[in-house]
Amino acid sequence: MAFSNPFDDPQGAFYILRNAQGQFSLWPQQCVLPAGWDIVCQPQSQASCQQWLEAHWRTLTPTNFTQLQEAQ
């Protein structure tokens, strides 16, 4: 089955990106990388990316919000 949206393709190759707030994103290899995001892992399968995220992403809370809470 062909996927019109590259973000939905389970057979696609994806980068793992991270922004300044410590949030992660899967990004299709064939798409232009967004500004403000750094490559954490080179393109790999969606399943491999999900395994990496499960092992490394501990919170959904952005870094700036966590720092604000700790300061109070």
Curated annotation (Swiss-Prot):
Biological process terms in GO annotation: enterobactin biosynthetic process; siderophore biosynthetic process
KO phenotype (gene knockout): Cells lacking this gene are not able to produce enough enterobactin for efficient growth.
Cystine crosslinks: none
Keyword Cell inner membrane on entry: no
Sorted UniProt keywords: Enterobactin biosynthesis
Gene3D superfamilies: Structural Genomics, Unknown Function 30-nov-00 1gh9 Mol_id
Source species, domain of life: Bacteria
Gene Ontology cellular component annotations, sorted alphabetically: cytosol
SMART domains on file: MbtH
PANTHER family assigned to the protein according to its UniProt record, in alphabetical order: ENTEROBACTIN BIOSYNTHESIS PROTEIN YBDZ
Family: Belongs to the MbtH-like family.
Annotated protein name in UniProt: Enterobactin biosynthesis protein YbdZ
Origin organism lineage: Bacteria, Pseudomonadati, Pseudomonadota, Gammaproteobacteria, Enterobacterales
Name of the gene encoding the protein in the UniProt record: ybdZ
